[in-house]
Every structure is written in structure tokens, then in C-alpha cells.
Amino acid sequence: MDRIRIVGGAQLNGTIPISGAKNAALPLMIAALLSDETLILDNVPRLADVAQLQRILGNHGVDILSAGKRPGDHEYQGQTLHISAKNIIDTTAPYELVSKMRASFWVIAPLLARMHVAKVSLPGGCAIGTRPVDLLIMALEKLGASITIDGGYVVASCPGGLKGAEIEFPKVTVSGTHVALMAATLAKGTTFIGNAACEPEIVDVADCLNKMGAKILGAGTPRITVEGVAKLHGARHTVLPDRIETGTYAMAVAMTGGDVQLSGARPELLQSALDVLTEAGATITVNNDGIRVARNGAGINPVTVTTAPFPGFPTDLQAQLMALMTRAKGDSHITETIFENRFMHVQELARFGARIQLDGETATINGVEKLRGAPVMATDLRASVSLVIAALAAEGETMVNRIYHLDRGFERLEEKLSACGATIERISG
């Protein structure tokens, strides 16, 4: 099993190109199931999760051609995918595929909308709390689907097709909004999605669906209106830049000191995180090429943050911020409101010498002067990169184990950090 070795202490200086957003690329790939024409997606990151979803879509009979990889390119490099779901041969998504990635459950929506039947295994992915699919099922039932759960599978059908409906989510749900949005595009009549997630990735998917002929209004607001159409056609769409990757590298620079240009980043996608970084002592400059992040000389200021749905501080940057705050001059407080059990990185950060106390949903971080390298183990995608951030600033050597979590969500991480002066290498086996 691969590991990453990091020797801390070096500042980061240079340029890091920001990849396409994983959290947009996955639902965009799934949306290709809605049409029998080809969907072309540019700026798709080369990630383990993307490769896994390609296998899942292939199981349904989807043809995917990857272009844009030249001889000598790294395995994980942005790509263009030509996705054709002209001939869907199977409407079952089996356990052995879906169990490896939670987002793959979303195939239930386009399969049901277009084929009127779907059988999808209950999902897998990061082990963060329960993350139930109840709200997704509720949305599909509102649209007229008949759903049962049998032997670990969700079995859904709508012989006459889906019908427009009023869907009101009891709480904001990104997954539920994606599923409702995709299903409603081919439903007969108009669908209203209330308490919808406002994340930029939702907007990106809606923009792509509209290019394919959907009639969606209000994406990015709490109320989305979808007027169903009979058919979607092919289109070409560029995946938006990854705001979580942007925030992660920005926090790494704030942690180590230095000056890095995050090329291609869009500040409006993570303004709340940039505001927190400014409060923590980083200098953020927006320019024509993206965002420049610097911290030279000054220490790290403590902050108090509560995670919230967009435009609030993203839960997917909570672990990275906690790593940064381990070196702050004072006590910081981070409250997690989105997912339960999302503090699994705390015990691993403690191995560096971090001082963190948990009280329910709130972590109090007592900043320390120095962190020391240690062998650590990744527990999930975002937690794993928080260990990398801590290791970059720690004295001595750190070995990060179980890095398959990193490969699920960060494209060419070692290369990007190494190019900016970090001592970091992947050790195979």
C-alpha cells in the first residue's frame, strides 16, 4: 500500500494549478445517463473516484473516451471525457461497485428518469457518520417513483415516467438536490425544489443540464424550478475549478509561510474560507490568473468557525483549518454542523503534538509552537490532507499511511507541492 513521506519545514513558493472540481465532475458524469447523445466534459480531474465512476457507468453500457492525455503526462492530469449513454444495457448498479464510492448511488436518478427503472446498491465512500439516503428516496417518491429496499438494494420504478412535484427538503442536502435536479429534468410537468443546496457544484450541474436542453431556473438559490422536457441532447461543458482544493492549498501556504499563486482559482467559490484565512493572518490577493496566497513572517492568528452550507464555511475544509490552527497563537474553536463524526483526524493530529479537546460538535485547538513529524494514518479524504498540511510544517519526517483516500480527491498532490518547494514523495508498496 502506498505511503507519502514528508520532511517538514520548507516554505511553499511558486504556482499551483487548480484542478477541476471532483464534487462537480462526478454528478456531471452521472448526468450523461439522461441523454442518448454524447456529453463532452472538459477539465475533469484524474482521480480514483473518477476512475471508479467510469467503471460504474461502463457497467450500465456507457462508452467513455478519455482525451487530452499526452505521452509522458502524469496519470492524474486533467482530461476531457466523451461520455455516450446511447445504449444503456443494465439498470442495476451492483454492490461491489457502488460500495466503493457514495456518490455513485446518484445514478438512480437518471436511470429512473430515462429508463423508468433502477436497482442500486446502498452506497459506500467515506465513513463519516451515517449520511443516509432517506432524503434522496423521499425526493424520488415525490416525483412518483415506487421504491422498496430489498437485500441492500434500492429498487425503484415509475412505469409511466416521473411527474413534476413540490419537493421540500427538511434540511439542506447536496446529494438530495443533485438527485432531485437530475430526476426532474425528464419528469412530466414542473418540479419545485425547496430548501435546495446552493453550492457552486449544484449550479455547475444545472448549467450543464441547461446546455443539454433542460429548463432549470434558480440553481444557486434555495428554490429551484425545473420544467420537465421530453429529451436531453448532447453538449460540451467545462468543469468548474475545485474550491476545496483551492482552500486546501491556501491553508497549506498559510501553515508553512511563503507565497503561492493558485492558478485558475475562482475566489467567489470560497469567499468564506478566504475571509477566515485573512483573519488567520494570510494575505489574499485576487488577480486575473486566480488567487495569490502569502504569509511572510507574521504568526497564525486563532479563529472561531462554524461549518455551514454554502456560502458558509465548507465542512470539506474543516479538517484542513484545524491543522492550520494547531500552530495558532492562542485557542481556536471549530464547530461542525454538517456531518456527524467528522473529527476522526483529531487523534492523528495529536500524534504531531497538537492539543485539541472535543466537546460534542465543537473542537477547541490550543495552538502550539512546534509540531513534530510522526507516522500517521488517513481516515477519510479531507482528514488525510489535513495530515499533509500538518506534516509540511512539522519538524522532521512524517509518513502518511492509507493515502488511497488522498488519491480519491486530490490530483497530483505530491507533484503540485513538490514544485513549490515541499519535500514530499510517494513510496510504493
Curated annotation (Swiss-Prot):
Pathway: Cell wall biogenesis; peptidoglycan biosynthesis. Its EC number is 2.5.1.7. HAMAP family: MurA. Keywords: Cell cycle, Cell division, Cell shape, Cell wall biogenesis/degradation, Cytoplasm, Peptidoglycan synthesis, Pyruvate, Transferase. SUPFAM superfamilies: EPT/RTPC-like. It comes from the Bacteria. Belongs to the EPSP synthase family. MurA subfamily. It comes from Rhodopseudomonas palustris (strain BisA53). GO terms for molecular function: UDP-N-acetylglucosamine 1-carboxyvinyltransferase activity. Cell wall formation. Adds enolpyruvyl to UDP-N-acetylglucosamine. CDD domains: UdpNAET. It is found in: Cytoplasm. UDP-N-acetyl-alpha-D-glucosamine binds at residues 102, 131-135, 316, 338. Phosphoenolpyruvate binds at residues 22-23. NCBIfam families: murA (TIGR01072), PRK09369.1 (NF006873). Gene3D superfamilies: Enolpyruvate transferase domain. This is UDP-N-acetylglucosamine 1-carboxyvinyltransferase. The active site is at residue 126.
